[in-house]
């Protein structure tokens, strides 16, 4: 976007020049923010590096959020690693208050997801502690450390994704997932249910990952180091995902590490080609988005794996807790409005999938085998439908759309 200049006479032959943006392109919000660029702004005014063109021109306004009124195809759009990032709709001036309010509420909902997710993990941590103190190490063997490790790697990858997008609330949710899962793995190692060498390696990766993401979020990390970290999690995610999908169907398929090793080779080759300029700009952006998508697909595969287990062993479903599934549905559901509001297709896909198929899907299975009451199932159904309907309606109001389906259209195809 080309800047304009306002010249103010100081008397004599001196003139003070203030650079500014086109008049109709931006409005200043009244709300101050200590991190004014922590969230993606509409129209691509904020790049992934979190630097806004206007704040580079004039430091006087650097503490005020800038929200574009119109969609502008800026240069920062082409630099984004994420499909449809920064492609939000365009709230008119008359709807700007609703836009601000819903922006604030969706951020609070996203941060509130910490509560149900913490309640999901906390009982397991307490139970493991009680068994360890009682010397009942065998009980901890029932907790699958490999599945926990996979979830931890997924949380770590998504933490990097949200840290790059400056989505503070979502990043905190993923950080909580990393820390709580690591505590469980530590307990399993103490009970000798997890090999200590794997735990040491995992601890090193977790420590490095948390430090790198924290430094990057606060602008204290070089681009080269961050890019190296992204390459590592991309290779790790692409290697683990096919192996998990293959292992789900063992013994119907041979037990083999071929899917993981093949994917590892492809991932390394893709990274090398991207960093040596062998890929087009579109290809480089695609490779850059893989870590987030593979992490999302890991979590999306969890309900598939659970449904497959329920199909093979219907009696096992009685071991599921309806409260646990409800908490899972609530945690993922709370992030749906924010993902829709910032037009993040990857985030919305993962959250909606987990809400419908992992949380609500297992509640439905429990109801079908008479493991939960009809009133509980009806309440969960009405609550879910109402919440999704509310998210679509308020998003349409915030952006000044006549139909909530326009929000979904913008999410997939852009404004």
UniProtKB/Swiss-Prot annotation:
Tissues where the protein occurs: Expressed in leaves and roots. Expressed in root cap cells.
Record's keyword annotation contains Isomerase: no
Subcellular compartments: Plastid, Chloroplast inner membrane
Membrane topology: Multi-pass membrane protein
One annotated Gene Ontology cellular component of this protein: chloroplast envelope
Any one GO MF annotation of this record: maltose transmembrane transporter activity
Record function comment: Probable maltose transporter. Essential for the conversion of starch to sucrose in leaves at night, probably via the export of maltose from the chloroplast. Required for root cap cells formation.
Segments crossing the lipid bilayer: 139-159, 176-196, 199-219, 231-251, 252-272, 286-306, 322-342, 345-365, 373-393
Record organism: Arabidopsis thaliana (Mouse-ear cress)
Highest taxon of the lineage: Eukaryota
One GO biological process term: starch catabolic process
InterPro entries assigned: MEX1/MEX1-like
Renumbered residue ranges of the record's region Disordered: 74-93
Protein name: Maltose excess protein 1, chloroplastic
Keywords on record: Chloroplast, Maltose metabolism, Membrane, Plastid, Plastid inner membrane, Transit peptide, Transmembrane, Transmembrane helix, Transport
Main location: plastid
Keyword ATP-binding: no
Gene label: MEX1
């Amino acid at each position: 976007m080309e800047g304009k200049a306002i010249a103010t006479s100081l008397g004599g032959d001196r003139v003070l020049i203030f650079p500014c943006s086109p008049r109709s392109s931006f409005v200043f919000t009244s709300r101050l923010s200590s991190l004014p660029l922590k969230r993606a702004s509409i129209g691509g005014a904020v790049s992934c590096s979190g630097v806004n063109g206007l704040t580079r021109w004039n430091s006087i306004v650097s503490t005020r959020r800038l929200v574009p009124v119109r969609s502008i195809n800026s240069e920062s759009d082409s630099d984004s690693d994420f499909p449809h990032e920064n492609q939000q709709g365009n709230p008119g001036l008359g709807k700007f208050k609703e836009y601000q309010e819903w922006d604030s509420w969706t951020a609070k909902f996203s941060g509130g997801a910490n509560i149900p997710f913490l309640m999901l993990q906390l009982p397991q941590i307490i139970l493991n502690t009680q068994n360890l103190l009682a010397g009942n190490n065998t009980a901890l063997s029932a907790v699958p450390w490999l599945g926990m490790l996979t979830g931890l790697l997924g949380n770590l990858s998504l933490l990097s994704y949200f840290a790059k997008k400056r989505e503070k609330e979502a990043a905190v949710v993923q950080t909580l997932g990393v820390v709580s899962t690591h505590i469980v793995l530590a307990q399993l190692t103490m009970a000798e249910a997890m090999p200590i060498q794997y735990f040491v390696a995992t601890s090193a990766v977790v420590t490095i990952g948390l430090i790198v993401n924290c430094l990057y979020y606060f602008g204290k990390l070089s681009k080269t180091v961050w890019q190296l970290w992204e390459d590592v999690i991309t290779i790790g995610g692409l290697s683990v995902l096919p192996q998990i999908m293959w292992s789900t169907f063992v013994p119907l398929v041979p037990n083999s590490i071929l899917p993981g090793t093949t994917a590892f080779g492809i991932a390394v080759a893709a990274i090398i080609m991207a960093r040596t300029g062998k890929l087009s700009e579109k290809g480089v952006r695609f490779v850059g988005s893989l870590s987030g998508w593979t992490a999302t697909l890991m979590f999306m595969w969890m309900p598939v794996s659970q449904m497959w287990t329920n199909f093979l062993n219907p009696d096992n479903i009685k071991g599921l807790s309806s409260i646990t599934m409800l908490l899972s549905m609530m945690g993922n559901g709370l992030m749906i409005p924010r993902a829709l509001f910032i037009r993040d297709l990857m985030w919305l896909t993962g959250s909606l999938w987990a809400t419908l198929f992992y949380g609500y899907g297992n509640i439905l299975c429990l109801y079908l085998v008479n493991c939960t009451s009809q009133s509980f199932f009806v309440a969960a159904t009405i609550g879910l439908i109402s919440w999704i309907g509310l998210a679509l309606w308020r998003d349409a109001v915030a952006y000044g759309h006549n139909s909530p389906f326009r929000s979904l259209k913008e999410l997939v195809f852009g404004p």
